[in-house]
């Protein structure tokens, strides 16, 4: 294994298992910061060594700037692992403001999604991240999720993004393992899987960890999986991946990850309410049952 490959495997600047944390809300729809602190402590105790707040699973499209800032502060108060804040938008100026304010609140890094809906050119993508980079003081994680953004980012564009001072990592939710290999080799950026079902395959091509939905209730076995992989015990890693497969399907299969993550946490008694803000709707009885069945099949209940 080359020195570069070892760097990809060993350099996990924000942790290995990072739940994309839901934002607990009270029955009136206001953010429940006390419940968020309880959840953050639970996740770390269960094995998470980094947390992502204000991401898609955290209902970032419907939470406001002051709530995002306060959530970062609240979580930072109670955990001693890296706290990454989502700070992405399809409006570059708004993205810059979010980056500045969440950094000031104490975020250890920012997760910046590709500018969705607007469908900019490759030059526009680079311009977006360059503007963010110029205002950043903390590391930037590029979030590539074409299913939500409608963008296909070329390998050459990744080369240009990697030249920016604060761009240090990628959350890859493209599902394209072959392209990920080339992008990693060319950029040297730390790579995080953005897909629970592809965690082990992404590890096999050099990813350092995952930003995950199922880690809300499965951080411990996911840590066991990555540790088994690190020591070369692929049989155990594969067994754990197969064990978690029903949970992956239960929480991700219908595409309502934020809803199902809250369902799983409610079943486990970790959050008091599954309230969500429209256009998302909290889980119904069928979804709660599905979350419970997925956890039970994965040996987590």
Swiss-Prot record:
Residues bound to pyruvate: 57, 211
Check the record and name the Pfam families matching this protein. Answer: DHDPS (PF00701)
Instruction: Name where it mostly resides.
Output: cytoplasm
GO process terms (BP): diaminopimelate biosynthetic process; lysine biosynthetic process via diaminopimelate
What does it do?
Catalyzes the condensation of (S)-aspartate-beta-semialdehyde [(S)-ASA] and pyruvate to 4-hydroxy-tetrahydrodipicolinate (HTPA).
Family membership, please give it.
Belongs to the DapA family.
Q: What is this protein called?
A: 4-hydroxy-tetrahydrodipicolinate synthase
Q: Which organism is it from?
A: Bifidobacterium longum (strain NCC 2705)
Gene behind this protein: dapA
């Amino acid at each position: 294994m080359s020195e570069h490959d070892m760097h990809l495997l060993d350099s996990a600047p924000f942790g290995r298992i990072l739940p994309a944390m839901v934002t607990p809300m009270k029955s009136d729809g206001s953010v429940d910061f006390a419940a968020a602190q309880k959840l953050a402590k639970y996740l770390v105790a269960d094995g998470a060594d980094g947390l992502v707040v204000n991401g898609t699973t955290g209902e970032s499209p419907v939470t406001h700037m002051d709530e995002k800032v306060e959530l970062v502060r609240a979580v930072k108060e109670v955990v001693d692992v890296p706290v990454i804040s989502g700070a992405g938008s399809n409006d570059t100026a708004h993205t810059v403001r979010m980056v500045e304010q969440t950094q000031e609140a104490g975020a250890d890094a920012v997760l910046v999604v590709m500018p969705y809906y607007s469908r900019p050119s490759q030059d526009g993508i680079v311009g977006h991240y360059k503007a963010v980079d110029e205002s950043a003081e903390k590391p930037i994680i590029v979030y590539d999720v074409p299913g939500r953004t409608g963008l296909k980012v070329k390998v050459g564009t990744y080369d240009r993004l990697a030249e920016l001072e604060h761009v240090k990592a990628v959350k890859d939710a493209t599902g394209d393992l072959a392209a990920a290999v080339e992008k990693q080799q060319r950029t040297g950026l730390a790579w995080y899987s953005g897909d629970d079902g592809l965690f082990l395959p992404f590890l096999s091509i050099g990813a350092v960890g995952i930003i995950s939905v199922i880690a809300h209730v499965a951080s411990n076995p996911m840590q066991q999986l990555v540790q088994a992989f690190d020591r070369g015990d692929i049989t155990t890693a594969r067994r754990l991946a197969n064990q978690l497969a029903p949970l992956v399907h239960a929480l991700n299969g219908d595409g309502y990850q934020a809803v199902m993550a809250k369902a799983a946490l409610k079943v486990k008694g970790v959050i008091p309410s599954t309230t969500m803000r429209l256009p998302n709707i909290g889980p119904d009885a069928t979804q709660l049952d599905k979350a419970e069945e997925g956890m039970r099949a994965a040996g987590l209940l």
